[in-house]
Amino acid sequence: MLFRLWVFVLLTPCYSWRPWTISDESHCKNGNSENPIVRPGFITFNFYTKNDTRIYQVPKCLLGSDITYHLFDAINTTESLTNYEKRVTRFYEPPMNDILRLSTVPAVKQFNLDHSIQPQIVYSLNLYPSHGIYYIRVVEVRQMQYDNVSCKLPNSLNELIFPVQVRCAKITRYAGENIYTHFFTPDFMILYIQNPAGDLTMMYGNTTDINFKAPYRKSSFIFKQTLTDDLLLIVEKDVVDEEYRFISDATFVDETLDDVDEVEALLLKFNNLGIQTLLRGDCKKPDYAGIPQMMFLYGIVHFSYSTKNTGPMPVLRVLKTHENLLSIDSFVNRCVNVSEGTIQYPKMKEFLKYEPSDYSYITKNKSIPVSTLLTYLATAYETNVTISRYKWSDIANTLQKIYEKHMFFTNLTFSDRETLFMLAEIANFIPADERMQRHMQLLIGNLCNPVEIVSWAHMLTADKAPNLENIYSPCASPVRRDVTNSFVKTVLTYASLDRYRSDMMEMLSVYRPPDMARVAAIQCLSPSEPAASLPLPNVTFVISPSYVIKGVSLTITTTIVATSIIITAIPLNSTCVSTNYKYAGQDLLVLRNISSQTCEFCQSVVMEYDDIDGPLQYIYIKNIDELKTLTDPNNNLLVPNTRTHYLLLAKNGSVFEMSEVGIDIDQVSIILVIIYVLIAIIALFGLYRLIRLC
């Protein structure tokens, strides 16, 4: 019965429409008693075209339902035959050859658990122990959050398909004049691109419930197929070659669909595409022709992530995969502005409840920064999340270990960069105690130095391709805006690597946050100011070529005329005030002696600068051991000369010049020296008396 209704609705536009009335009487006009045109309980429709007349009869009960009114609202019964014929030929019809793409067998390892294993419920998540490893069924935590109301699909589809009642998640992004909107449902994904030259709709997934209006047929829009899913392409044929050239060369689409069921392979593809986009300098360019491809792959990644590979998987692997997913979210959000909507996986939020005492469910490897990983997952949620003090303590220890490992100018590893990327995202986006925020920004920013810049340049040419996380450099820290194009050029020119400067500056522009809202003392600083900020526990130092902020300032006088260094100290809890003049001044003090006992200069920063090139690097000193290592002449870490100088920016806001005398730390305190001298004098006096007695 429903089939007959569909036939009627589909054929209505074909044969035009005539007014109709419902009658319970039988009429035999143009018929006979054995074949009546109208019968009780039925509605007769007469369609006329030239000399041809077609008659359809539909039970009246069907036309009185809500769905009938819904369907009639979706069709234009007054359209002329001329307009109807014109729009039939308007759309691009993909070639029939090479439509079928047989998905390869996923290479991802499939984990099969013994069905007799009983789950352990940990914070509402079912975990399955097997051979010392805990597993979780992916389907339990990868469910995308869909809106509670029915999704309103793109208006451009109204002409072609009947309305679809389905819940979805929706996110919209802008790139110049183009608008990119993703619709995610449990069965299919839609990428809708609004372009002044012509729109494009790409629909992928199980399209069984998508019904096209006459004269269109679904088969006319199928661009590619797998064994289970369709990729429909809806675009006017006049704009395909002009705006969407990747459609003509379907290699990109084919390669994507080859791995459509393998989430980790798709994540790898997107990482490679993202790195290429960065290295070409195309990120944030509204006219970049590759954005439609990026948006298509992005949609496929999220759709496959939320619907494929639903079986058991080790908990750590689930978390690491989600980490990778969030990193591509972060990258896309940086490249293409988000205007509306989010994509969230609410069940993943349950992992945020795990404390260090629960980490054995995730991994027994103590070297994995689990607290950092879990807190990084929290950056996906718009609402404030609460991170326990135990996690913050663990995060601080992780950062401190990385800093101590590389504070004296050693190369960061891929693993270190990945962890620093997560730590930087946490520092930039997760609310925390201000002291913690300041400390994280300080340590991450201080890992940027000339050695890191050269190492980063070499990494871009390494055989092992980086991903969107481990390509991160601490030079992208918001407190290191002094890492400018001219500074990078100076460093790379010395190393004969200046050809990579544009790539590095592009990456810095993408990964560096637009402001410093998390550190109140410097939140008023303009992002365009080439300043370095050092948020110490009790004071913040800003090093800049001009006056940029209210505080106690000091001008370095040893530099050449073309190089200006102004150091401004801002006391803790001071209101940030942007200024272009000197507010208050202080003198440069000379450091003559450093005690190794009381460590007056711990929690301070040693700054190296060049008379010509300006500030070069900063080293935060936490304890006396680090200070001894730094100033030990045998380590050659501080090598003053006629051009290179060192300043100590103290925790109380004072600035000291570290002379050659001051670089050598006294290994004993002055009091002990006095005691030793007194003992020696007494001993000599006793020896003298003894000799006299003899």
Curated annotation (Swiss-Prot):
Its main location: virion. It is a single-pass type I membrane protein. GO terms for biological process: fusion of virus membrane with host plasma membrane; symbiont entry into host cell. Residues 17-671 are virion surface. The keyword Membrane applies. Glycans are attached at N51, N76, N148, N206, N337, N365, N384, N411, N538, N573, N593, N652. Residues 1-16 form the signal peptide. InterPro entries: Herpes_gH, Herpes_glycoH_C, Herpes_glycoH_C_sf. The chain crosses the membrane at residues 672-692. It is found in: Virion membrane; Host cell membrane; Host endosome membrane. Residues 174-234 are annotated as: Interaction with gL. The keyword Signal applies. It comes from the Viruses. The heterodimer glycoprotein H-glycoprotein L is required for the fusion of viral and plasma membranes leading to virus entry into the host cell. Following initial binding to host receptor, membrane fusion is mediated by the fusion machinery composed of gB and the heterodimer gH/gL. May also be involved in the fusion between the virion envelope and the outer nuclear membrane during virion morphogenesis. Belongs to the herpesviridae glycoprotein H family. This is Envelope glycoprotein H. It comes from Human herpesvirus 6B (strain Z29).
